[in-house]
Amino acid sequence: LHIVVPAIHRNRHEIGQIFKDKLGAKLENDEPESLNAIARDHLRKDFEGLKLGLSGVNFAMSREGAFWLIENEGNGRMCTTAPDIHIALCGVEKVMESFEDAATMVSLLTPSATGQFIPTYNNIITGPRKNGDLDGPKEVHVILFDHNRTKMLAHKDYYEALRCIRCGACMNFCPVYDQIGGHAYQTTYPGPIGEVISPNIFGIDHTGDILNFCSLCGRCSEVCPVQIPLADLIRKLRCDKIGQGENPPMGAKNIHHNAMEAFAFKQFKKAATKGERWRFALSKAHYFNWFVQNLSGALPVIKKWYAFKELPQIKKDLYKEIQAIEGVIYE
């Protein structure tokens, strides 16, 4: 799952098999040109019979009363011109003052998303077809939705995330997203930007767990074309999640208390602040291998997680290896 390339997690062989199973397509080969031809023929027939087309909006221009759709495939143009009714869904943060402002954003979006200078298709829609027009919808409706975006705008920190132009650059450079993919986030917006937007839009209680995905390496902040400090915002959201935002870190009534997490950190603190305890913990860490292998399936806390993941084995001589590392001062 990727906001620019939704099928990036599939290769051409898998896509060919999906076309064969779902569309009944006869595949001579699974070359990209052949797959594109199948998709084009199938979708065109669907578009010709549609009465209503639903699209998103890249940028809306209030002065001109128009909105801008960017694409490379052509399906967006079919969706907005072939049906009699076109409904465009637009987040309030995508509204610009003028065409010039939107053009500046487009000049950032396309190179950051796909490396192109300009997209293949630029659709600037000003309304339904006029008298004498041969094509286009008879009705155009624009729905502006908020979904807590105005609350983000009023926040002293999180308003910066509303600058996002949905280029996906932060995902392309995120080492965590590269390993787990977009579906692991289980939200509309994956990757670093999703870790900021999703808790604000859908609620930190519902999507706050994805904040733990971030390694805080900061690569996303470096490549963002609109300079959103993503790593800093993720860190602030983590503080909010555990009740340490604007509230006292100790004794705050709204702390999302997790007894097991609190116990684990308490034990870690005991070991990490005493040299002899820390050395003892490292020397016995390999016993954890037996615990994982024999008890992981029985403990409901980690049963589901371990069904899809496999922990690396801890070496028996880990303590000695750490001592032997050059430059490490071990007290």
For every predicted segment, state its role:
Residues 164, 168-171:
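Phosphate-binding glycine-rich loops and their immediate beta-loop-alpha structural context
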Residues 97-100, 111-118, 172, 179, ...:
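Acidic/polar loop patches that form or flank catalytic/metal-binding clefts of enzymes
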Residues 117-121, 249-252, 296-301:
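Short coil/turn segments at secondary-structure boundaries
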Residues 1-157:
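The feature marks the mature, well-folded catalytic cores of soluble enzymes
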Residues 132-161, 176-296:
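Ferredoxin-type iron-sulfur electron-transfer modules in oxidoreductases and energy-metabolism complexes
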Residues 285-331:
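Short linear elements at protein peripheries
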Residues 40, 123-130, 266-270, 305-309:
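Amphipathic alpha-helical surface "interface" segments used
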Residues 63, 172, 222:
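Short alpha-helical basic/polar micro-motif
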